[in-house]
């Protein structure tokens, strides 16, 4: 049976570091990039005799995320110890949640070629992150950095509702957008603050019995997620077709070789010997707290995208880019209050503004001009006060200096000539000097029209209103 005769079954476990200033059970900083083992204390180092204290902000972020993903929030959730030995886990156990997580039974809607699809979310639970092992230290050594130990995490576990690698990528992108909009995570896959594991299995099409699943790790980009899942699907089908059985295991995506490699046998829950965390009381979340969190939720990416297409009449492509990041969407809406041709505004955003931000490496928050000034510039272009090309130059100067568009236009002499009489005088002069070209044009060589436009614009040093130049030339040439 070829791969096409099998149905992939995929679920994702998303691990999102929370944007708190301190760790989940102590006051150590969560800042990324500090000197190894600098952001540590007896609590996150697992020293004897210390007691954890829950960072309230972590619970607030968990409730906010659960509500955004349409989960049921448990009034009471319980902490557990997950026991395993690894060099970067100093206590020998991880404080997490097991059978009573804070959030359950949610969903996230994604777009597929067949339309919208709701991916069910099994659970969301809070836990502490482990440290980080560094295996390329040289000299055959592995080093341990415990700065990350105790950093607060949300683990968001989907049901196995994804059916191919593209759906998995779409789900992960949608999840990242939601978490970033909520302000609970920065969405950075490269630094590992937003990462995922994929559980992949295959079954013959038409079957209702899932195959044996393998967990894939080291998926630190959307591209690697897609490549790893596609490889693993083909690998499992090949194993089955060869008469073998897929072994439940954890496999590592090898970026250099483009394959998954066996890492270890896949553990079951009983392997971790979960038991209640004796040093932390159950977490109680009141109905009033849940209601307040629900009321404070921002407009989420999918709802904002739909509103941008309906309220502003934007194509789905434009709306998707503009709403991908909340600051960009907010800035567009601020500009829309000063300039009402929303499609043209979108074109300037997706073209010149995005180009300038990328080339200069400037965050949107550092823009030196106001939404009102951008609206003023686009209005000047519409009214013929400055050409579209000159308008781009003005925007670049606004970007670099923060000066008002009117001042830049005046200083650089970019004002466009829209005086009909002045343009007509230049047109008459050009036509009088090019009688031969006029004959060619009237004989059917219409491409000569571009020659006349160029001559007029050159004579006016590029400041002639193009629409008026074209109109007057056509009138004079008898069109």
Swiss-Prot record:
> Key word Protein biosynthesis present in the record?
yes
Membrane-spanning intervals of the chain: none
Q: Which reaction does it catalyse?
A: L-glutamyl-tRNA(Gln) + L-glutamine + ATP + H2O = L-glutaminyl-tRNA(Gln) + L-glutamate + ADP + phosphate + H(+); L-aspartyl-tRNA(Asn) + L-glutamine + ATP + H2O = L-asparaginyl-tRNA(Asn) + L-glutamate + ADP + phosphate + 2 H(+)
Pfam families registered for this protein in UniProt: GatB_N, GatB_Yqey
The UniProt keywords, alphabetically, are: ATP-binding, Ligase, Nucleotide-binding, Protein biosynthesis
SMART domains given in the database record: GatB_Yqey
Which biological process terms from the Gene Ontology are attached to this UniProt entry?
Answer: glutaminyl-tRNAGln biosynthesis via transamidation; translation
Q: What is its EC number?
A: 6.3.5.-
Which GO terms label this protein's molecular function in UniProt? asparaginyl-tRNA synthase (glutamine-hydrolyzing) activity; ATP binding; glutaminyl-tRNA synthase (glutamine-hydrolyzing) activity
Keyword Cell division listed: no
**PROSITE patterns assigned to the protein according to its UniProt record, in alphabetical order:** GATB (PS01234)
Query: What SUPFAM superfamilies does the annotation carry?
Result: GatB/YqeY motif, Glutamine synthetase/guanido kinase
Record text on subunit structure and interactions: Heterotrimer of A, B and C subunits.
Q: What does this protein do?
A: Allows the formation of correctly charged Asn-tRNA(Asn) or Gln-tRNA(Gln) through the transamidation of misacylated Asp-tRNA(Asn) or Glu-tRNA(Gln) in organisms which lack either or both of asparaginyl-tRNA or glutaminyl-tRNA synthetases. The reaction takes place in the presence of glutamine and ATP through an activated phospho-Asp-tRNA(Asn) or phospho-Glu-tRNA(Gln).
HAMAP family linked to this entry: GatB (MF_00121)
Annotated family: Belongs to the GatB/GatE family. GatB subfamily.
Q: Which PANTHER family does the record match to this protein?
A: GLUTAMYL-TRNA GLN AMIDOTRANSFERASE SUBUNIT B MITOCHONDRIAL AND PROKARYOTIC PET112-RELATED, GLUTAMYL-TRNA(GLN) AMIDOTRANSFERASE SUBUNIT B, MITOCHONDRIAL
Task: State the name under which the record lists this protein.
Answer: Aspartyl/glutamyl-tRNA(Asn/Gln) amidotransferase subunit B
* Organism from which the protein derives: Myxococcus xanthus (strain DK1622)
